[in-house]
């Protein structure tokens, strides 16, 4: 049976072509990933808010495959409306599903806490409005964002078209002498091929939204397996 250790149910933006593939490549033996999608019409605040309105329907679909944990796999879609909204959204969906429902924004917060770092650089594919929302969300959580760099991509399907070396260079450009950890934000960017090399070259921890999501899903279900080649986070309990 696939998923005899854990079944992860992932709710993705309809435009995302990366997260599913990265989970398939990263997940340890016995962990399966099952995906449903919510319509994203535009990569802007209005489009992301409309997408979140369909989360209940998608959660129902994930429950029908007996997922052990359900992941709302959109970073900007879960930080956009702030800390209180994210917490309420997560708790309401968890109550509906009668099992843990996680959000990417909070998983990345938990990853930063586990790494024990407060001075962060964030690299994103986002437009300015979403970068500003990310800045507010993580600053409100108590982090010192020393640098933020975005690609300014307006068309969601173009996010996943960036080859890994583009994300490598974007990540490097966001790091300053003050940076203690690099966060590659967005489940739609392809980064697992370069993440370990980027961390090694920078000499500081680096993680992506997708790595934080897998780490959180595994730990929620008591799977503490360390996965090599995916940065410092996947070496933590």
Tell where the protein language model's regions lie, with residue ranges.
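Hydrophobic alpha-helical segments within soluble ligand-binding/sensing domains
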Residues: 56-59, 101-116, 212-223
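Hydrophobic alpha-helical
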Residues: 168-201, 214
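Short, well-structured alpha-helical segments in soluble
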Residues: 52-65, 167-179
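Glycine/small-residue-rich loop that forms an oxyanion/phosphate-binding "nest" at active or ligand-binding sites
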Residues: 59-106
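Periplasmic-binding protein-like
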Residues: 68-73, 121-122, 179-186
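N-terminal glycine-rich anion-binding loop in soluble enzyme alpha/beta folds
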Residues: 1-57, 123, 128-163
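Short, flexible loop segments at boundaries between secondary-structure elements
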Residues: 153-158, 204-226
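Conserved beta-alpha
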Residues: 89-154, 231-235
